[in-house]
């Protein structure tokens, strides 16, 4: 089912055009399972009719003395990545990598809406394959355009044990399904792809 989100709000207190800082209250009932502000999550900031999309890269408490029985002011640092636009009410929202109007002081920020998150990750027309689902919203598929992926260099990187070999195997299987004409050569000195 669809994840029910806490729609608590925060407010922009700083913005330089690339990044913004949002001030919010972390309630005393917040726990790890319902944590609303989390690194790696997308949020949205209302600016007129559009919603700026930001990626949370850091969260810090204003007061380092944390008491689980009290509310705390937290600062959420976000990188501005684009905006959600909707030209007409009857049309679905879409994501644009540009930003027409930047957040002002006091602009309202909240967890991104389901439809907006889907718009950010919407598949373009092309040779699309589903490789999983989004960590932020499992009901939204994670997709790639095989032709775009193969038209440029790409790498799968990560630390030991995070699943690089599994990811490469999945990618190769999906690519070959869509493009059976493609030739694949794997140099495997550590015998990770023997099966």
Predicted regions and their residues:
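Glycine-rich phosphate-binding loop of nucleotide-binding enzymes
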Residues: 128-195
């Amino acid at each position: 089912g669809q994840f029910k989100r806490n729609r608590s709000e925060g407010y922009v207190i700083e913005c330089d055009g690339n990044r913004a800082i949002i001030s919010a209250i972390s309630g005393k009932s917040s726990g790890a399972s319902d944590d609303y502000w989390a690194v790696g999550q997308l949020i949205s900031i209302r600016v007129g009719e559009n919603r700026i999309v930001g990626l949370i890269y850091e969260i810090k408490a204003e007061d380092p003395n944390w008491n689980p029985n009290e509310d705390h002011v937290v600062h959420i640092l976000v990188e501005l990545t684009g905006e959600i636009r909707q030209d007409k009410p009857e049309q679905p929202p879409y994501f644009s990598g540009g930003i027409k109007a930047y957040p002002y002081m006091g602009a309202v920020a909240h967890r991104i809406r389901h439809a907006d998150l889907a718009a950010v990750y919407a598949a373009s027309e092309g040779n699309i394959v589903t490789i999983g689902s989004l960590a932020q919203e499992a009901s939204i598929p994670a997709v790639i355009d095989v032709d775009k992926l193969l038209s440029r260099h790409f790498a799968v990187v990560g630390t030991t044990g995070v699943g690089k070999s599994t990811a490469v195997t999945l990618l190769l299987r999906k690519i070959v399904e869509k493009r059976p004409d493609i030739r694949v050569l794997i140099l495997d000195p550590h015998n990770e792809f023997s099966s």
